[in-house]
C-alpha cells in the first residue's frame, strides 16, 4: 500500500501578487522551491492563514531570490496580496519509507526570505518564540543542499 504523506511545506509565506487572468498555478521563488524540495509543476495545497481558504494547484518557478509568491488564475478570488499562506506538498511512499521519512519545513520572514529550515511537521515558528528542538539553523541546513 502507498501512503500519501506530507513531504514539504513553506510556512507562513506572504503573498506578493495575484493575477486573476493568468491561466492558473502559484509562482514561487526558486530558492524556496529548492529549499523545500518542491518541483515546478508539483501539486501543492495552499492554506490561507489570513482568511481560512484552502485550495490545490501546481507550482511555477519564480525568479530566484525575488521572494515572489504569486497566486494565479481563479485562486486570486480566494487569496490576496499580503495574505499569509502555507504551501504544503505531499508524496506517495510505501509504509516503511513513510515511517522513517523526514519532511522539509521552510520558515520564511515577511519578505519570503528563508530564516530557518526544519524537519518537524508540527513546527510553527512564530516571532518571539524559541526555535523548536528539531529545527536547524539556516547555515547548517543550507550546507546540505
Swiss-Prot record:
GO terms for molecular function: aspartate 1-decarboxylase activity. Its cofactor is pyruvate. Its main location: cytoplasm. One of its GO terms (biological process) is alanine biosynthetic process. Belongs to the PanD family. NCBIfam families: panD. This is Aspartate 1-decarboxylase. It comes from Micrococcus luteus (strain ATCC 4698 / DSM 20030 / JCM 1464 / CCM 169 / CCUG 5858 / IAM 1056 / NBRC 3333 / NCIMB 9278 / NCTC 2665 / VKM Ac-2230). The lineage of its organism: Bacteria, Bacillati, Actinomycetota, Actinomycetes, Micrococcales. The gene is panD.
Amino acid at each position: 500500500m502507498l501512503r500519501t504523506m506530507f513531504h514539504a511545506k513553506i510556512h507562513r509565506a506572504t503573498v506578493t501578487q495575484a493575477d486573476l487572468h493568468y491561466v492558473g498555478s502559484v509562482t514561487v521563488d526558486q530558492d524556496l522551491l529548492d529549499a523545500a524540495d518542491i518541483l515546478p509543476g508539483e501539486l501543492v495545497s495552499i492554506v490561507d492563514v489570513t482568511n481560512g481558504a484552502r485550495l490545490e494547484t501546481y507550482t511555477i518557478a519564480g525568479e530566484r531570490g525575488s521572494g515572489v509568491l504569486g497566486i494565479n488564475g481563479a485562486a486570486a478570488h480566494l487569496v490576496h496580496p499580503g495574505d499569509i499562506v502555507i504551501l504544503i506538498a505531499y508524496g506517495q511512499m510505501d509504509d516503511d519509507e513513510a515511517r522513517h521519512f523526514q519532511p522539509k519545513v521552510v520558515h520564511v520572514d515577511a519578505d519570503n526570505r528563508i530564516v530557518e529550515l526544519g524537519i518537524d511537521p508540527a513546527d510553527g515558528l512564530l516571532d518571539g518564540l524559541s526555535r523548536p528542538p528539531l529545527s536547524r539553523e539556516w547555515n547548517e541546513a543550507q550546507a546540505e543542499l
